[in-house]
C-alpha cells in the first residue's frame, strides 16, 4: 500500500464522516417537528416514490427544464457505478480493476457514462444560461437574491469541473494505452464512446510523463470533486438528491385539497355532540410540566416533522411560486419562500439547541420574524403550489396551520373574513341576505 492509497483512505473516511455528522444534524432538525404517522399503505407509497422520485414523472410538466434535469439526473445515477471502481482502485492501488472481469460490458458502461456526461454538460450550460443570461423570471424573485442564487450556480460549476475531470482521466488513459503505457490490463484502444476520440485527437502526441500527470490530475480531481460535492450538499438546496425519496414516500396520500382536522378540536366537537357526555365535566388535567396544546403553528416546533422535511427537500425551482395566483397578481406570498423560511428557522433553532441546550430561546418565531401575516392571508388555498411541486412538497399545510394560530390563538383575522364568518353563522351563507330570500332570483 503506497502513500497515495493512505491519502485516499483518509480522504474517504474524513469525507463520509463529515457528511454523516451534517446529515445527523439535519435529521435532528427535522425531529423538532411534532409526531405524525405516515406509514399507512406502504405499497402505494413505494409505487409513488418509484414513479415520482426515481422516475421523475412530474419534472416533464415543463418539458425543457424537465428533460435537461433528467440528463443531469441520469448522469449522476449511472456515474455511481464507475465511482465504485474508483473507490476500489483508490483503496487497493489497482487501475481499472473491473475492466478485465467485465470485458465488453465494462466498455458499454463507461461509454454510457461518457455519453450521459456530455448530455449533463449540455444541460449544465443550459441551466447556467437560464439562470444568468435568459434570467427566467422565477429565478429572479426577491427570495432568490444572495446565497440562493449563488448556490444554484456553484453546483453547476462543480458539475462542469467533475465532467472535465472524467474526460481528462479517460482521455489521457486512452492515449497512454495506445502507446502501451497505460496501467490498465491489455493493450489497444479502450473503445470508449467519447474518450477514445479524445485520446487520439486531443491527448495524442503528448509525451508519456505529461499523459501520466494528466491522468492522475483527472483521477484525483474526480475524487476531490465527488467528496466536495457530497459535503457541500448539506449546506445546499441540492440536498433534494437524497431527501426527495423519503419525502415522496411519506407524502400525504389524501386527495389534494383535503385539509387535516386538528385533533384537539375534533375531540371537543365529538364531546359536544355526544348525548351521553356530561356538559359540566371538568377538562382532564394536564400531566405535570405539560404545556397546553397550541391551535395551529407559530414556530417550526408546532409543525409536524413532515413539514420540516418538506422544507429540506425544497429544490427552490420556483414552480410553486410561478403558478401561485396570489404571487402572479402581485401579492407578497411566495410558496417557495415559505419553504425556505421554514428550513432557515429549523436550522436556527437546531444550531441554538446544539450550542445552548434544550432551553434555547431566541425570542423569535416563524410567524412574524420570517413569515408575515400578509403572506399567510394572501393564499387562496387553490393548491397550485402542491400540484406543481415535482417532489410532492405541500406549502399549503404550513400556511393553514399559521392561519389557524392567528385566528384561534390570537384572534387575528382580516375584517373581510369577519364579515363572511358572521354571515355564515347568521345566514348559513357568506353573503349578507336573509335565507328566506334565496329563491328570489327565479323571479327576476
Spans of model-derived segments:
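Acidic, Ser/Thr-rich low-complexity segments on the non-lumenal side of membrane proteins
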Residues: 51-66, 262-315, 319-323, 328
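Ferredoxin-type iron-sulfur electron-transfer modules in oxidoreductases and energy-metabolism complexes
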Residues: 282-311, 327-433
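Flexible gly/pro/ser-rich segments immediately N-terminal to CXXCH heme-c attachment motifs
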Residues: 112, 146-147, 210-220, 303-315, ...
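Short acidic (Asp/Glu) and glycine-rich catalytic loops that position anionic groups and cofactors
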Residues: 25-30, 223-226, 316-322, 379-383, ...
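Membrane-embedded alpha-helical bundles of multi-pass integral membrane proteins
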Residues: 1-280
Amino acid at each position: 500500500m503506497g502513500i497515495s492509497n493512505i491519502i485516499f483512505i483518509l480522504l474517504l473516511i474524513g469525507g463520509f464522516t463529515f457528511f454523516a455528522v451534517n446529515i445527523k444534524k439535519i435529521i435532528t432538525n427535522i425531529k423538532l417537528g411534532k409526531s405524525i404517522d405516515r406509514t399507512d399503505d406502504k405499497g402505494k407509497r413505494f409505487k409513488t416514490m418509484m414513479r415520482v422520485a426515481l422516475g421523475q414523472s412530474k419534472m416533464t410538466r415543463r418539458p425543457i427544464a424537465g428533460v435537461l434535469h433528467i440528463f443531469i439526473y441520469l448522469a449522476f445515477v449511472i456515474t455511481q457505478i464507475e465511482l465504485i471502481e474508483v473507490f476500489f482502485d483508490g483503496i487497493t492501488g489497482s487501475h481499472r480493476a473491473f475492466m478485465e472481469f467485465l470485458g465488453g460490458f465494462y466498455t458499454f458502461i463507461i461509454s454510457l457514462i461518457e455519453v450521459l456526461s456530455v448530455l449533463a454538460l449540455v444541460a449544465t450550460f443550459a441551466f447556467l444560461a437560464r439562470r444568468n443570461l435568459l434570467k427566467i423570471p422565477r429565478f429572479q424573485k426577491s427570495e432568490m437574491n444572495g446565497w440562493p442564487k449563488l448556490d444554484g450556480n456553484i453546483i453547476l460549476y462543480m458539475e462542469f469541473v467533475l465532467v472535465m475531470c472524467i474526460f481528462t482521466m479517460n482521455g489521457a488513459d486512452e492515449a497512454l494505452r495506445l502507446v502501451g503505457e497505460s496501467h490498465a490490463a491489455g493493450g489497444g484502444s479502450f473503445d470508449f464512446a467519447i474518450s477514445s476520440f479524445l485520446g487520439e485527437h486531443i491527448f495524442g502526441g503528448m509525451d508519456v510523463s505529461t499523459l501520466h500527470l494528466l491522468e492522475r490530475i483527472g483521477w484525483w480531481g474526480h475524487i476531490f470533486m465527488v467528496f466536495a460535492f457530497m459535503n457541500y450538499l448539506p449546506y445546499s438546496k441540492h440536498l433534494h438528491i437524497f431527501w426527495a425519496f423519503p419525502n415522496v414516500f411519506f407524502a400525504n396520500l389524501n386527495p389534494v385539497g383535503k385539509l387535516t382536522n386538528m385533533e384537539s378540536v375534533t375531540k371537543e366537537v365529538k364531546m359536544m355532540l355526544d348525548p351521553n357526555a356530561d356538559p359540566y365535566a371538568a377538562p382532564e388535567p394536564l400531566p405535570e410540566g405539560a404545556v397546553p396544546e397550541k391551535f395551529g403553528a407559530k414556530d417550526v416546533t408546532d409543525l409536524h416533522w413532515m413539514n420540516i422535511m418538506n422544507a429540506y427537500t425544497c429544490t427552490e425551482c420556483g414552480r410553486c411560486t410561478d403558478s401561485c395566483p396570489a404571487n402572479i397578481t402581485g401579492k407578497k406570498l411566495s410558496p417557495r419562500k415559505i419553504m425556505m423560511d421554514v428550513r432557515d428557522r429549523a436550522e436556527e433553532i437546531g444550531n441554538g439547541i446544539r450550542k445552548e441546550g434544550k432551553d434555547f430561546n431566541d425570542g423569535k418565531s416563524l410567524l412574524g420574524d420570517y413569515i408575515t401575516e400578509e403572506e399567510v392571508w394572501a393564499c387562496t388555498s387553490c393548491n397550485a403550489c402542491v400540484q406543481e411541486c415535482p417532489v410532492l412538497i405541500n406549502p399549503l399545510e404550513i400556511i393553514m396551520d399559521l392561519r389557524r394560530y392567528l385566528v384561534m390563538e390570537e384572534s387575528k383575522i382580516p375584517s373581510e373574513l369577519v364579515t363572511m364568518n358572521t354571515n355564515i353563522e347568521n345566514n348559513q351563507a357568506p353573503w349578507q341576505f336573509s335565507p328566506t330570500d334565496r329563491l328570489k332570483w327565479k323571479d327576476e
